Design a protein with these regions (language model features):
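Hydrophobic/aromatic beta-strand elements that line small-molecule binding cavities or substrate pockets
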Residues: 20, 54-57, 80-86, 103-110
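Beta-strand/loop substructures that line and gate deep hydrophobic ligand-binding cavities in soluble
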Residues: 92-140
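Hydrophobic ligand-binding cavity/cleft-lining segments
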Residues: 1-49, 170
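A short, structured loop/turn motif at beta-sheet edges
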Residues: 26-27, 59-60, 85-90, 107-117
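Hydrophobic pocket/interface hotspot
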Residues: 29, 39, 65-67, 84, ...
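Short beta-edge strand/loop motif at the mouth of beta-sheet-based domains
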Residues: 17-18, 37-77, 158-162, 166-170
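A conserved amphipathic terminal alpha-helix motif
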Residues: 123-170
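Intrinsic-disorder/low-complexity, polar/charged segments enriched in Ser/Thr/Lys/Arg/Asp/Glu/Gln
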Residues: 13-19, 26, 52, 64, ...
């Protein structure tokens, strides 16, 4: 299942749930979600970028997660600041966004050595983020994440090492 699933009944309660399966090991999927060198490649919907120098991650309870997404078309910036409530590598990330109070819990479930289900549950979602357009944007960021994971997984595979003589571990 590589589709994003959302529960309409949760939307009415100010909650969103997204589930997506990625063709990559759980440890890699988790690492990409806490490493600014990876986040810069996929954080935000299509049409935005997240400059590496504007991403801060201190993945520990009480640590800060900060990003700035830049709209590629007009240069508008969208900042996010959150504080980690819980971090259990490679199983779970939970944070609360400072500006909205939205709580996000992301679970990483191994479905085998090279498949991971990511379950994202957002609570206290601001009404502005409950629109179909915003949800489509979030889904497109998961598409970008899948593409990034595919590139990284390919670069770290034994086949890649055999062809290039090196194995890139990130």
């Amino acid at each position: 299942m590589n589709e994003v699933t959302m529960m309409a009944e949760d939307r009415a309660a100010g909650e969103l749930r997204f589930t997506r399966v990625f063709e990559a090991p759980r440890e890699l999927v988790f690492r990409c979600m806490i490493d600014p060198d990876h986040l810069t490649h996929f954080w935000g919907p299509q049409g935005t970028s997240a400059p590496r120098e504007r991403i801060t991650v201190d993945a520990r309870p009480g640590g800060v997660f900060e990003t700035v997404m830049v709209n590629d078309a007009d240069g508008n910036e969208y900042a996010t600041r959150a504080v980690y409530d819980e971090v259990r590598e490679p199983e779970l990330l939970a944070w609360t966004e400072s500006h909205s109070g939205m709580k996000v819990v992301t679970r990483f479930v191994a479905l085998g050595p090279d498949r991971t289900e990511v379950q994202i549950h957002q609570r206290f979602v601001p009404k502005a983020f409950l629109t179909p357009e915003t949800q489509a944007g979030f889904s497109s960021s998961l598409d970008r994440f899948a593409a990034h994971l595919a590139r990284v997984a390919a670069a770290t595979s034994p086949d890649h090492a055999e062809k290039t003589g090196k194995r890139e571990l990130r």
